[in-house]
Amino acid sequence: MGDFNLALVIVAIVVCVIVFISSIYLLVNYQHPDDANQAYFPKFVVVFGLSIAMISILMLPADVANRHACRHSIYNGACNLTLPMKDLWLAVYIVDAVLVFFIIPFAMFFYEGDQDKALGKRIKSALIWVVTTAVVCALVLGILYGVIGKVDFSVRHLSSATTTFPTSWQFSNNQPCIGNTARQCSAYTANAASEKTWSMRTTFPEYVVALATIVGSVLFTIFGGVGIACLPLGLITAFIRRPKAVITRSQYIKEATELGKKARDLKKAADALHQEERSGAKGRKWRKNVKAVEKELLQLEEDVNLLEEMYPQGEQAETAWAFTVLGYLAKFVLGILGLIVSVAWIAHIIIYLLVDPPLSPFLNEVFIKLDDVWGLLGTAAFAFFCFYLLLAVIAGAMMLGLKLVFITIHPMKWGATLMNSFLFNVGLILLCSISVIQFCATAFGYYAQATAAQEIFGHTLQSLRGIKYLYKYNVFQIGFVVLAGLTFLYYIAFGWRRKKPSGRFQLST
């Protein structure tokens, strides 16, 4: 056993308890009042899903610590590792896949079902959708695993000749056992291009994790690439667009009247869509109109919040305005800090992943030096950079949801988040968390070397037949950097401008 095994077990247990409590805290404080004392099954799924997502992110630092406990061993097999990390990785990600593709869709269909229907009919309707999805997924997985569920490792064939053992037994320190001509194996003169392909079938759990990672990587590349730029720049532009002064009472009455009129128009549109839903006319046009109304509702809520900020009321009006000013200053500071982290991420991807050979270990060296300062400092910084990517994914999904009609918006608001939005975001986090771990295991390969995560994500996944070329040519990393650059240019060109009315429910000027 390693020197720090007991401490590692204690830390793992404590972290799991903290994660579970944090998930409950987020649910209680973000849930909508309409969901209080009901929707218990979706709430259980949300808490369990959030816990799995956070634990999966923290498992990579735990994997590194698990390996460091055996750093004095000559080879990995010489140490009895505390935690069976490979089994834990596979178990967590199988649970992750089941939640994303089966449990969360069932909970969403059940929650969004017609409340006027009986409980049994709502369960039956949700089960039909989930069973159909399960059958399709099982067929696709089974066919793909049977046909191309193999890994192809490129190996170099090395061989050497044998030397007859002498029988004279007359040796000295000047006469070695093996002759001078046999000190080098024939591999010393082997052709550098003498490579062969060693194929073997991967295990089914590893194949499920691999395919889930591919699906998550596509979403992670799009949302994460956009989000890593818009997360800090959005905070900075919010500071630039902040209200500079309190408006007069007459201006407030004018704007409030206009917003009230727009709210009534929006309610009429929502009622009309609800009538169409009851009549069964839920076609493509209906879904498009629903998404348009959702976007207009979000914009209306933003306008109301902005109006309340520009005209604080009550006995503590001056205090409220002071907190508003401080809030925007905090956004600016957090935006600057986030911009530094985002630039560090992009720079690390370019100089360590896209340049071959890498120009520098960069953040890997930073984490190692922080570990030398204090044992958990590098691990904490490592976990922070991984969590930052998840925040970027959520920010990117929100931005694209507001800009593109075909992407559904599920905003997270303090004290006003419905369970379907909770479930959607938990599913997105779970799906992208697999890719975040794979991305971090690759990006921080020098720091996380010889871990179980690297064995799964760095060896098996990147050698999987039909998939390996996506990683061989850095498709996801290039897409991530390109989207981040385009988003940055968008904010430079348009982000500093104050928003102008663009729709029927916009705040008037």
Swiss-Prot record:
GO terms for cellular component: plasma membrane. It is found in: Membrane. Disulfide bonds: none annotated. Keywords: Coiled coil, Membrane, Transmembrane, Transmembrane helix. The keyword Coiled coil applies. It holds the Pfam family LMBR1. The chain crosses the membrane at residues 8-28, 44-64, 90-110, 128-148, 208-228, 332-352, 382-402, 422-442, 475-495. Residues 251-316 form a coiled coil. The keyword Membrane applies. It is a multi-pass membrane protein. PANTHER family: LIMR FAMILY PROTEIN DDB_G0283707-RELATED (PTHR31652:SF0). Belongs to the LIMR family. This is LIMR family protein At5g01460.
